[in-house]
Structures are given as C-alpha cells and as structure tokens.
C-alpha cells in the first residue's frame, strides 16, 4: 500500500506540497488547473504551455462556511476560501482553522483523504492560516 495524491495531475506530494499549473510561453499567463486545450488569454495552442510548479501559499480573498454538502466527505461544516496563490492564479480550497478571514495568509498542507479500492491512502491539499 502506498500514499498517493487524490489528483496526481494537479499536486506533487512534497514538503511543502507543490501545485501543478502551467504558463503560456506566448503571453506568460499562469493558470491552474492546467488547461489541455490552450491558453484562455491569448488563444495559443496547448503546445505553447509549459508545466509550472506553484507554491501552495497565498492570500484569502473570500470565505464561506459550508453547512450542507451532497457528499459524505468532507464532513460539514467546513470552510472554503478563494485564494490568490503567490504564483498568480486564483483557486478555491478548503481552509482549516478558526482565524480564516479575508486577507489571511495561508499555506498548503497535505491531509489524509480516503482509501482507494486497492487500499492505497489518498491525500489531498487543504490550506491553513500561517501563524
């Protein structure tokens, strides 16, 4: 049994974790998640996109607490934030801790998710407020 990323094409299991995005070589736009079709900004083809490691750190721009969810995991309530990553793109992610608010600096942490059908432990990325 091994530990694997729940979404291996989006996340590298390092310490600290690395988010896998891309940069357009034509216009320098940085994006996450990687777009297999090309650049949304300038229209360049996917051949003009290069893989880019993004630091799992950023600033919270909006926060919401989810009290009802259509899946059993994650258990409710949980907090979701809109985070501008230090590398540029904006993502939505679960944030833990009681001091989550607009303007908070957050960093990514790997958390155990579920097990797959083969008994491998899956981990996912969440964020926590930087102390």
Predicted regions: what they are:
Residues 75-90:
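Short, basic/aromatic beta-hairpin or loop at an interaction surface
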Residues 90-96:
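Short alpha-helix capping/helix-loop boundary micro-motifs
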Residues 64-69:
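Short, conserved beta-turn/loop elements at beta-strand boundaries and strand-helix junctions
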Residues 111-131:
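OB-fold/S1-family single-stranded nucleic acid-binding modules
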Residues 1-19, 101, 124-131:
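A broadly conserved sequence feature marking short terminus-proximal activation segments
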Residues 15-57:
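Cys/His-rich short segments
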């Amino acid at each position: 049994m091994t530990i694997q990323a729940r979404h291996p094409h989006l996340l590298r299991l390092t310490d600290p974790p690395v988010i896998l995005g891309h940069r357009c070589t034509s216009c320098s736009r940085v994006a996450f998640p990687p777009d297999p079709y090309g650049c949304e900004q300038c229209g360049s083809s996917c051949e003009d996109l290069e893989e880019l490691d993004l630091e799992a750190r950023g600033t919270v721009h909006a926060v919401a607490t989810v009290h009802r969810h259509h899946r059993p995991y994650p258990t409710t309530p949980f907090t979701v934030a809109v985070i501008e990553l230090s590398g540029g793109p904006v993502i939505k992610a679960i944030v833990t801790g009681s001091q989550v608010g607009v303007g908070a600096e957050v960093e990514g942490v790997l958390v155990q998710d579920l097990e797959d059908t083969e008994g491998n432990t899956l981990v996912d990325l969440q964020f926590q407020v930087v102390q």
